[in-house]
Amino acid sequence: MDTAEIRRRFVAHFEHNTTVGAHTPVPSASLLLDDPNLLFVNAGMVPFKPYFLGQEAPPYPRATSVQKCVRTPDIEDVGKTTRHGTFFEMCGNFSFGDYFKEGAIELAWDLVTRPLADGGWGLEESKLYPSVYEDDPEAVALWKKVTGLPEERIIRLGKRENYWSMGVPGPGGPCSEILYDRGPDYGPDGDFGPKGEDRYLEIWNLVFMQDELSAVRSKEDFDIAGSLPKKNIDTGMGLERVAFLLQGKANMYEIDVMFPVIQKAEELTGRRYGADHDDDVRFRVVADHVRSSMMLIGDGVTPGNEARGYVLRRLLRRAVRSMRLLGYEDPALPELFPISRDKMGETYTALHRDWERISTVAYAEEHAFRQTLRSGTTIFDQATAELKQAGGSQLSGDKAFALHDTYGFPIDLTLEMAAEQGLAVDEVGFRRLMNEQRQRAKDDAKAKKGQHRDASAYRQVADSLGRPVEFTGYDVVTDEASVRGLVAAGGVVSSAGPGDDVEIILDRTPFYAEGGGQLADQGVIELDNGARVEVRDVQSPVRGLIVHHATVLSGEVSIGLGAHALVDVERRRSISRSHTATHMVHKAFREALGETATQAGSENSPGRFRFDFSAVGAVPESVMADVEARVNEVVLDDLAVHAEVMSQADAVKSGAMALFGEKYGDRVRVVSVGDWARELCGGTHAGSSGKLGVVKLLGESSIGSGVRRVEALVGSDAYRFLAREHVLVAQLSDTLKVRPEQLPERVHDLVEKLREAEKEIERVRVGQLLAAAGELAAGAAKVGPVNLVAHRADGAGGGDVRTLALDVRGRLPQGEPGVVVVIGAVDGKVAVVAALNDEARARGLSANELVRAVGPLVGGKGGGKDDVAQGGGTDASRIDEAITLVTAEVGRVAAG
């Protein structure tokens, strides 16, 4: 049975169920949800969290889904075991205060054991073992009742294995797992603990949410405050695990949606999966990471150095690196990505629709990584050459870590290349530094997590309201309302006085809360009792709640007072113009660069905006000019900007663009600029394109691999910028005595003349330097048999000092020992260069030793080889002492 059929049967089983009732099939959410505690959706229940936490009323009593998930805590372990991967699909059924334990057990057992011919999965009952939480006798009784299994077949496990919580106060409860016995080839009989996971494979976990947890200290240490008012069901079944069982495969990497990638990798590398353990790990890494990275890019992630982008970059580069370790050094992703697309695209059709964008991002990252490998190889070669010259045999952990951390050079390649040269690598030191870096990252993550404020006060206010705060700002900028909640210092309060910072919740508001790239409104709220507050910021910390961050200017604010809310109109209009301009620039870039130029982020502020979008390489100036011209053409056309609410399906049919990573409901708001640009958007906008006045693009830059940023001005801000530019051009024209259109040519001529003058100055300076070299060589002092030039060159920097020293050495008498040390100083910075000929080195003299001796005297250090060495320092006052030291040191060694 192929994976698509397993998925179809799962959804159909719940959608058409008549035992507990039909479940609403819910499409998979994006891998990216607005959750500060999650990089990616990592469980099937994540999109339903607001319902389980009581933040929102569920729109259905029962639901079923097959959710895309990514888990990346141990990327480096992927492939080493065959049970886990970074991307997986989690099949689940959910009950929100409807059926409970018995219904969940019946539904799961029925699907798992029902014969294939009847639409089930046909697993043998004799190989199935239910597990329960050891303190849940109700579950034991229900499993016996539903399945008829004897009690000894029902496995009791502790909190670590069979009690679920979110790791924080909130809902929790015991769970039951369905374990599949793979037989004695995979482990001993009866070991249902962690060591027996290979044999007794968990295929389905049923979570019975029944408890309210007041404190959670660890997986096994928590306090149960009482029972939840409504009991819920959350189940999760790993699609890939069931697939490899039903397809008769040894592990998830061999199922129909993954193994074709391994087969293609076999074809490319000439190696065979199953022939070598290390190669097998690499094949599995390739299969997993290609699929994971493709799905992440599909949902809008782009490679970067932080957070989601960094995870994607690691996945892509590990896949490329694994192919290299398998012996394939050509671009691999263009060969592998289409294989995964064809398999996953049967279910996730957007992979085909967005293929140009997905492939462009992935292939560009591989190209960048291949360049990194080339530069890293150069650094590696330098490090090993120095190591061999020093007589060493082990590359230090510091050097291996620097190659990995600074140059992106994988440790596996460092180990492989070192072994080829007969060298070892200090892996212990490398791992220590890696662990220290991981710990710093964890500490940073904890610190950032701590910055997210406790939402309990907001939930308390939201519960008291009973309905979402009504946003009226699409239609008005002033409105009458009443104060329904006050929050200060993280807690609910009843009043606030002059000078107090307070968060105010009204029952309705014209103030726009920051979101969708648009900054929040500002303004004032006037209370019926004469009090007045200044609104500095507006946020929506929990769904349905709009919170005004304010300072009380006068009077006292208390719950129940009537309020007159006044938005700063000019600021709102300016931001709205920026937001409309962002939509227009987005559309213009897609026209100029193609459909791959999708928005990756934005910020709309008063009079200016920034717009991030997917693109490979810098955008040519000609394209920037075309985009700016196109946008301003639409401004002159004065197209009406209008918004309408429709179903998401109708919005897609209308051609409206949706932004990756944004979460949309069944009903969406579509903003259109005439019939030209159409996007899903919840922000505020200008009434027509003509209201923008003028749009000026300031420039574009890279903010990460495959992502460019454009910054621009709108309206009066753009006009003022252009006016300043006009004045500047007029001043330059007057100064250079040419017309404005002749300025580029005139400036070019001036720059060329300046360059020629600089070259002439350099020729004169070098000539003077070389003339001095002849005089210095002729005046060399005799220190025993050695011709010594120890010279102070004030005003000479490092490059000149080196040139002078080498030239003087070449002018000393042939066949006699010669030593040259030149010490220069510019702006207090000291440069030291020593140059020796072969005869001097034969007498035991060393440029490296001379520079190392001089370095501390001039407040620095240095070194190099025996023939040429250089150094620097910061204490020019002791240069004469250094010259004396050189003379003494040469005399001492020469005499010995």
Swiss-Prot record:
Cited SUPFAM superfamilies: Class II aaRS and biotin synthetases, Putative anticodon-binding domain of alanyl-tRNA synthetase (AlaRS), ThrRS/AlaRS common domain, Translation proteins
Catalytic activity: tRNA(Ala) + L-alanine + ATP = L-alanyl-tRNA(Ala) + AMP + diphosphate
Cofactor note: Binds 1 zinc ion per subunit.
Keywords: Aminoacyl-tRNA synthetase, ATP-binding, Cytoplasm, Ligase, Metal-binding, Nucleotide-binding, Protein biosynthesis, RNA-binding, tRNA-binding, Zinc
InterPro entries: aa-tRNA-synth_II/BPL/LPL, Ala-tRNA-lgiase_IIc, Ala-tRNA-ligase_IIc_anticod-bd, Ala-tRNA-synth_IIc_core, Ala-tRNA-synth_IIc_N, Ala-tRNA_ligase, Ala_tRNA_ligase_euk/bac, DHHA1_dom
Entry's EC annotation: 6.1.1.7
Region (Disordered): 439-459
Alphabetical list of NCBIfam families matching this protein: alaS (TIGR00344)
Recorded family membership: Belongs to the class-II aminoacyl-tRNA synthetase family.
Function: Catalyzes the attachment of alanine to tRNA(Ala) in a two-step reaction: alanine is first activated by ATP to form Ala-AMP and then transferred to the acceptor end of tRNA(Ala). Also edits incorrectly charged Ser-tRNA(Ala) and Gly-tRNA(Ala) via its editing domain.
Protein name (database record): Alanine--tRNA ligase
Taxonomic lineage: Bacteria, Bacillati, Actinomycetota, Actinomycetes, Propionibacteriales
